[in-house]
């Protein structure tokens, strides 16, 4: 990359970032937080945050990168995708109606508490089973890729560890105080550190716990944007340190700075992977929607499907094995746009942008239902569901459409099943006479008593 080529790329980069940041800032000023703001920030992080790191690696350390024309193609396609996404998200499909509708879901106090207890039980039980089978893998494995080897049993259980976070989200949304907010951080980070040591380097639960803590703080006004930036910088350094421990690296001096640059870029902003796909575009055999179906294979136990393929050819594995010819045992993230390119080439990019806009719109709709519901237990469940799905939005932007679809379906099924079991348990307890009603009076004593004072409303709560 020459200085002239860098200058051209920088102009395109600057225009793209200003365009997306302007739209995101206007949305933030309007609502402070919604899933469009979240997706936009994650999108900026994935496709634009890594550009300065790439430039420093090129000019400071002489690292070879993808030819400039493909870097430019990656940047332009990312900007075009966001423009189509934004139009899709903002397009109103039907008129707003003020007519109240009958609630499709009702949740009481007992059901809400049973739901988070079941979610937490799933997470703790699967962590315990994984630990009994494998011990502390962080101190046993010589390399991170060994996690996916046959020596480690019960790898599929890792997908259940995450449900500890939605459980703690329900607890927080039932109270929504600063103390509950801080307890959410302490509990989820402690659990994340435990899973990091047991699994041998998986940082996802830690990243999500910290990110959700920040998002909640922004929503409630407990932290400012400057505090968010400072926390983000702290998070980047923390993730770098955990990455060093994960890969067993001991670095110092210039090499430490070099390692920080490429690990941070690859962790938070694998945008060069999209450029690699454009470079190898003529070698790609479009997979259609097959990667989405294949990604569900990992959720099917081998005892139920004895002939289940051990190697799943989703978009990440196709990119790693077929495009990069990399068989190290780790799957390299193709990003959201990369997965669309693998599935259907250029034509899938606008179609994917429209679909993603509708998905984000749906999450915002559910989130608004939760915020505005008068039943605080139902509101807690709906908001915890939405915030719990943040991990799936991260998967969407970083890993791709196929990984997102399988994970969001899995998340909805487990979360919905816990709520259904909670309702069933409540019905059984109530039928057995173990649920007693607690009467709470909402006292609103007028300053001057009058004969026409309306009696205090009585609200029933289940214990």
UniProtKB/Swiss-Prot annotation:
Major localization listed first in the record, in broad terms: membrane
Protein's GO biological process: enterobacterial common antigen biosynthetic process
GO cellular component, as recorded: plasma membrane
Spans traversing the lipid bilayer: 6-26, 39-59, 65-85, 112-132, 154-174, 180-200, 201-221, 222-242, 340-360, 377-397, 408-428
A Pfam family reported for this protein in Swiss-Prot or TrEMBL: WzyE
Pathways involved: Bacterial outer membrane biogenesis; enterobacterial common antigen biosynthesis
Coiled-coil ranges from the UniProt annotation: none
Entry's localization field: Cell inner membrane
Protein name as it appears in the record: Probable ECA polymerase
Functional summary from the UniProt entry: Probably involved in the polymerization of enterobacterial common antigen (ECA) trisaccharide repeat units.
Family statement drawn from the similarity comment of this UniProt entry: Belongs to the WzyE family.
Keywords: Cell inner membrane, Cell membrane, Membrane, Transmembrane, Transmembrane helix
This protein's record includes keyword ATP-binding: no
Assembly and binders: Probably part of a complex composed of WzxE, WzyE and WzzE.
Membrane-topology descriptor: Multi-pass membrane protein
């Amino acid at each position: 990359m020459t200085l002239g080529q860098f200058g051209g790329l920088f102009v395109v980069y600057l225009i793209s970032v200003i365009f997306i940041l302007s739209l995101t800032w206007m949305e933030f000023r309007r609502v402070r937080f919604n899933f469009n703001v979240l997706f936009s920030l994650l999108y900026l992080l994935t496709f634009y945050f890594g550009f300065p790191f790439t430039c420093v690696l090129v000019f400071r350390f002489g690292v070879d990168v993808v030819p400039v024309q493909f870097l430019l193609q990656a940047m332009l396609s990312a900007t075009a995708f966001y423009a189509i996404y934004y139009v899709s998200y903002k397009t109103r499909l039907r008129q707003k109606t003020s007519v109240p509708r009958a609630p499709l879901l009702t949740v009481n106090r007992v059901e809400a508490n049973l739901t988070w207890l079941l979610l937490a039980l799933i997470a703790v039980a699967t962590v315990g089973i994984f630990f009994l089978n494998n011990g502390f893998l962080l101190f046993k494995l010589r390399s991170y890729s060994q996690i996916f080897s046959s020596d480690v049993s019960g790898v599929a259980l890792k997908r259940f560890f995450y449900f500890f976070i939605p459980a703690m989200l329900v607890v927080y949304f039932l109270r929504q105080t600063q103390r509950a907010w801080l307890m959410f951080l302490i509990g989820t980070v402690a659990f994340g550190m435990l899973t990091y040591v047991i699994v041998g380097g998986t940082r996802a639960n830690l990243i999500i716990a910290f990110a959700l803590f920040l998002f909640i703080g922004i929503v409630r006004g407990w932290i400012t944007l400057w505090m968010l930036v400072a926390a983000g910088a702290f998070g980047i350094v923390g993730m770098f340190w955990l990455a060093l421990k994960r890969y067993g690296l001991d670095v110092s001096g210039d090499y430490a700075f070099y390692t920080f640059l490429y690990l941070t870029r690859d962790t938070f902003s694998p945008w060069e992977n999209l450029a690699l796909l454009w470079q190898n575009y003529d070698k790609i055999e479009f997979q259609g929607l097959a990667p989405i179906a294949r990604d569900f294979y990992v959720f099917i136990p081998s005892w139920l499907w004895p002939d289940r393929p051990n190697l799943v050819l989703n978009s990440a594995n196709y990119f790693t094995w077929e495009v990069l010819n990399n068989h190290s045992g780790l799957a390299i993230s193709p990003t959201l746009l990369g997965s669309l390119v693998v599935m259907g080439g250029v034509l899938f990019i606008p179609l994917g942008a429209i679909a993603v806009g509708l998905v984000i719109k749906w999450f915002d709709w559910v989130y608004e239902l939760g915020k505005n519901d008068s039943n605080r237990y139902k509101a807690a469940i709906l908001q915890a569901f939405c915030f719990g799905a943040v991990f799936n939005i991260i998967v969407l932007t970083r890993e791709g459409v196929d990984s997102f679809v399988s994970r969001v379906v899995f998340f909805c099924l487990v979360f919905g099943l816990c709520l259904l079991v909670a309702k069933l348990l409540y019905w059984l307890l109530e039928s057995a006479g173990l649920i007693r009603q607690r009467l709470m009076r909402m006292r609103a004593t007028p300053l001057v008593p009058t004969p026409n004072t309306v009696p205090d409303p009585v609200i029933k709560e289940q214990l």
